[in-house]
């Protein structure tokens, strides 16, 4: 009997394929997004050094008590704004967006648009 591959396996396949092409540098680090059912996480990574430069999530102390839910588009937009603010304070303006195989829709799109509105270029 044929077994249909699950959505996470397909997403992981897309993520691996794209990660061969996307690489964050010191001049233009990679903005990585991870989405769970309850929260959303974003990091800006310099792949040359293997270092996370800036990170934000719905579990960050700045957002934890202020959001009714961490798993909706409003929370994702708040994470995008916080990430952009932290990145600009760290001197990062230009990034490469790595959606990690997720469809550019909903929470991923809300985070990306809020980060762009906050001053990040990608």
From Swiss-Prot:
Gene that encodes it: rplR
Composition-biased stretches (Basic residues): 12-22
CDD domains: Ribosomal_L18_L5e
HAMAP family on file: Ribosomal_uL18_B
Species of origin: Pelotomaculum thermopropionicum (strain DSM 13744 / JCM 10971 / SI)
Annotated stretches, region: Disordered: 1-22
Quaternary assembly: Part of the 50S ribosomal subunit; part of the 5S rRNA/L5/L18/L25 subcomplex. Contacts the 5S and 23S rRNAs.
Annotated family: Belongs to the universal ribosomal protein uL18 family.
InterPro entries linked: Ribosomal_uL18_bac-type, Ribosomal_uL18_bac/euk
Highest rank taxon of the organism: Bacteria
GO biological process: translation
Key words, A-Z: Ribonucleoprotein, Ribosomal protein, RNA-binding, rRNA-binding
Record's GO cellular component terms: cytosolic large ribosomal subunit
GO molecular function terms listed in the Swiss-Prot or TrEMBL record: 5S rRNA binding; structural constituent of ribosome
Entry keyword annotation includes Ribonucleoprotein: yes
Protein known as: Large ribosomal subunit protein uL18
Bias-annotated ranges (Basic and acidic residues): 1-11
Function according to Swiss-Prot or TrEMBL: This is one of the proteins that bind and probably mediate the attachment of the 5S RNA into the large ribosomal subunit, where it forms part of the central protuberance.
Stored Gene3D superfamilies: 3.30.420.100
